[in-house]
Amino acid sequence: MKKILLVLFLALGIISFSAPNFINISKIEKNGYEIGGDKENRLLIVKTLEKENTMENIYISYDFIEENPNVPNRKHQFFKETSPEGLEFTNSFETKRAIIGKYTEINNTYVYTFVSKKNKVKNCYVSVCYATDKNFQKNELEKVCNKFLDEGESYLK
């Protein structure tokens, strides 16, 4: 699982750090996230939660690109096309708020992607990659998706 998460992490981008002024970096760090990568057009924050014998990883990506209705679909497609070997795309569906993707690894690790379809801040698209051992059903995923997108958007000023 660590290799898969590392590849996802690298695929989302890593460089030096300088966040836009509409992102609250102190709040991000206060909530246990680390800056995982920063490019001119993307900021990635990362958090690992260890509970008993399990580990969960949360990656929140902020893409700074001109608004375009095709961006969420392209980001979802990017996740599908760049998923690491050993991580199988299971299915996806859309809600009013997001495109949700589900991936499964052989050892019962599940990776969920949540790509927001609407921007809270102009030209800033939020997406989340969540790795866990929990196999959520479709009816549960919308609630999980909203929780993580709400969290990601809470760091926007």
Residue positions per predicted region:
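Sec-dependent N-terminal signal peptides
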Residues: I4-S16
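Signature of long, low-cysteine stretches enriched in small and polar/charged residues
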Residues: E81-N119
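Short, surface-exposed coil-to-beta transition loops
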Residues: E40-L44, T54-Y59, I106-F114, Y125
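Generic recognition of long tandem-repeat/solenoid scaffolds
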Residues: R42-K51, I99-Y103
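A short acidic-to-branched-hydrophobic micro-motif
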Residues: V46-H76, C124-V128
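N-terminal "mature-domain start" segment
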Residues: F17-V46, C145-E153
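Long, charged/polar, surface-exposed segments that mediate recognition or autoinhibition
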Residues: R74-E85, L141-C145
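Surface-exposed amphipathic alpha-helical segments
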Residues: V128-K157
